[in-house]
């Protein structure tokens, strides 16, 4: 679960980290009032969406008057911001952040993730702030410095100082950086985060460090013990189909193709999308119904898939281990009858009672094509989608 920039900065302030004074605003009037509370300009106004690249898309602007603030708010509030990280529809802008402008002398990067390779929280720091860290890692990896957090000792101040020295910081900047490092590490561990990022972490012309931007990602598996973080969830930033799927504990990710995919198991779902691509098709989604592929969940999965108007055929790929394929077939038949599916449905069943399940599908009299293998299923669904 991602947070907005203003929410991240509110947390930073609570943990004693330096961030510009600012207010999240939902109306042009609130934006003007926020500028008055902050004091004399210039100010920076920022669209609040869960996506990077806002500046290049016009969603961040330095302004010198309240008239400019109102104009920016009227331009973006209620609209959608399209960046290189969004799809063609963009993300809805329901709030803008108004904050004091900062005199920037240098931009740095500081962030942390859970590294699966080391099974540790790893901090990364770089002198290349203000740009995508993925680009830095690809083009100049030597400019990224790391600190691995030992789970037994937790973050240590010396690690922050080491990173500061590697970044070329001097004097009071070193102690400020170490304090920010320790604060971020505390937030990361106490709030069950999967990602924390300040990009850029800036050095001002007075040699002070300021958290100019903030990005936080909370581990969704830990939300049950993070009620405050859960309250910060903004459903407007999610694909409505993904939100609906989450309510049924379905793992759904919308894609740009025209072949809907329903699979039990994340690995099998990835393999299914690969083989659809191999045979010339384009998956419309990733959808893992999990081990409990009941009729109700299969029905809901069909509804979610078919809510995408680009879908012209559906591939159902089920491997029956503990789950019996004949019961899955009953669920698919019932779901197709209830939902009223009007596109071809190709089903591949393998495993426990697969033959009986395939026979039930063939005898159903519905527009369901029983495939003999995964390759056969991919070929048939691609052909059906092209014919549609």
UniProtKB/Swiss-Prot annotation:
Substrate binds at residues 264, 321-323. ATP binds at residues 46, 53-55, 99, 102, 107. InterPro entries: ATP-grasp (IPR011761), ATP-grasp_succ-CoA_synth-type (IPR013650), ATP_grasp_subdomain_1 (IPR013815), Succ-CoA_synthase_bsu_CS (IPR017866), SUCC_ACL_C (IPR005811), Succ_CoA_ligase-like_bsu (IPR005809), Succinyl-CoA_synth-like (IPR016102). Succinyl-CoA synthetase functions in the citric acid cycle (TCA), coupling the hydrolysis of succinyl-CoA to the synthesis of either ATP or GTP and thus represents the only step of substrate-level phosphorylation in the TCA. The beta subunit provides nucleotide specificity of the enzyme and binds the substrate succinate, while the binding sites for coenzyme A and phosphate are found in the alpha subunit. It is an enzyme of class 6 (ligase). SUPFAM superfamilies: Glutathione synthetase ATP-binding domain-like, Succinyl-CoA synthetase domains. The keyword Metal-binding applies. The gene is sucC. This is Succinate--CoA ligase [ADP-forming] subunit beta. It catalyses: succinate + ATP + CoA = succinyl-CoA + ADP + phosphate; GTP + succinate + CoA = succinyl-CoA + GDP + phosphate. Its cofactor is Mg(2+). HAMAP family: Succ_CoA_beta.
